[in-house]
């Protein structure tokens, strides 16, 4: 191991001087004698390297001895990480003892080559009606979950983890990037109570941690997911929140001496996002499907950060405060959410027609709402009255009780297969259920439960 010494400290950025013949490579991990890990970002010449600190730089001083590990940051991978909470370095932070991993992988890896990649037209059934119908997920696809505070991003994520774990016996990796510590704690206990903790690896870099941790924690989680994929599994990789990954990069960029670009973001924004997103892909052995929560600063979708994220996504699930205020959960906006998979060649003609039919009726209802508000229902034509009645049933039928929310709702969760989802909505569009009151469609699973509920009304 070659050794150097600290020559300059500026916040989270540390300069270290090494002998000329033993300069560390970019991305090598260095260990300070105080136990802090640094990651090399630039070589400045004269044996000096500029690093970011993966931990607080409090108490460091010039002249401290630094050793080169000659490797990038190595984190534990494999099934031993399931059910554990780790930090950016893969160290356990759940007070449950050592991880006991059999293997460690470097967090900086190249994306799979073209030959290894497989095209993903196979759908991943989530059991959530509105998602499977309107914005279906592809196996190995990337999904953006857009929403403000309190509309249900985290609950949707937890339900997806639960459904994949129980129904598909798949593994999930959750990377909390710049998370609130309280949310991370809630998430852990929810997973524990839902009995799916043994199928999830949790990696946290909270809001109060230095920017180096928040910048790298997404790569730590991704490395764990890649290991599961290479073992031939279909993995779900959750990132909450991808915006804070960008923000951490912005924080260290100026300290590293780079000129800021538009809106003060780092000039390497597109490259940093690309490096992360290109590794999230399916190979011939397995798939990584990612669900990323996206915070939109000041609701401006043209902001460089969400705009860069958009370029990588296959599906966008937009959660709407207006729908949540009606008590319809999951509060997914069926007119705003999109998916590249919603194509007759991928999902089949029937699914496509039903999804477009549902959107058409809801759009027409949206237009009629103004007339109803002023003149009332009686002034509508018979045809429009029928549209409104069916639209209200569809709106309610898009709601669904979640397994992870049983504690709050008091109703047992439901998993609905894609076949049942299409059958139910097709029936409503065709007028088969025009005689059933709309209350029967609220918070149920399949259409058979609607008929059962209607009998008891």
Swiss-Prot record:
Q: Does the keyword Cell inner membrane apply?
A: yes
Which controlled-vocabulary keywords does the entry list? ATP synthesis, ATP-binding, Cell inner membrane, Cell membrane, CF(1), Hydrogen ion transport, Ion transport, Membrane, Nucleotide-binding, Translocase, Transport
* A GO MF term: ATP binding
Function as written in the Swiss-Prot or TrEMBL entry:
Produces ATP from ADP in the presence of a proton gradient across the membrane. The catalytic sites are hosted primarily by the beta subunits.
Q: Which HAMAP family does UniProt cross-reference here?
A: ATP_synth_beta_bact
Pfam families, alphabetically? Answer: ATP-synt_ab, ATP-synt_ab_N, ATP-synt_VA_C
* Binding, ATP: 147-154
Q: Report the membrane topology from the UniProt record.
A: Peripheral membrane protein
Top-rank taxon of the source lineage equals Bacteria
Which proteins does it associate with, and in what oligomeric form? F-type ATPases have 2 components, CF(1) - the catalytic core - and CF(0) - the membrane proton channel. CF(1) has five subunits: alpha(3), beta(3), gamma(1), delta(1), epsilon(1). CF(0) has three main subunits: a(1), b(2) and c(9-12). The alpha and beta chains form an alternating ring which encloses part of the gamma chain. CF(1) is attached to CF(0) by a central stalk formed by the gamma and epsilon chains, while a peripheral stalk is formed by the delta and b chains.
Q: Which class of enzymes does this protein belong to?
A: translocase
Coarse class of the protein's main subcellular location = membrane
Q: Which organism is it from?
A: Haemophilus influenzae (strain ATCC 51907 / DSM 11121 / KW20 / Rd)
Q: State the InterPro entries in the record.
A: AAA+_ATPase, ATP-synt_VA_C, ATP_synth_F1_bsu, ATPase_a/bsu_AS, ATPase_alpha/beta_chains, ATPase_F1/V1/A1_a/bsu_N, ATPase_F1/V1/A1_a/bsu_N_sf, ATPase_F1/V1/A1_a/bsu_nucl-bd
Cross-referenced CDD domains: ATP-synt_F1_beta_C, ATP-synt_F1_beta_N, F1-ATPase_beta_CD
Gene3D superfamilies from the UniProt entry: 2.40.10.170, Bovine Mitochondrial F1-atpase, Atp Synthase Beta Chain, Chain D, domain 3 (1.10.1140.10), P-loop containing nucleotide triphosphate hydrolases (3.40.50.300)
The protein's name in its UniProt record: ATP synthase subunit beta
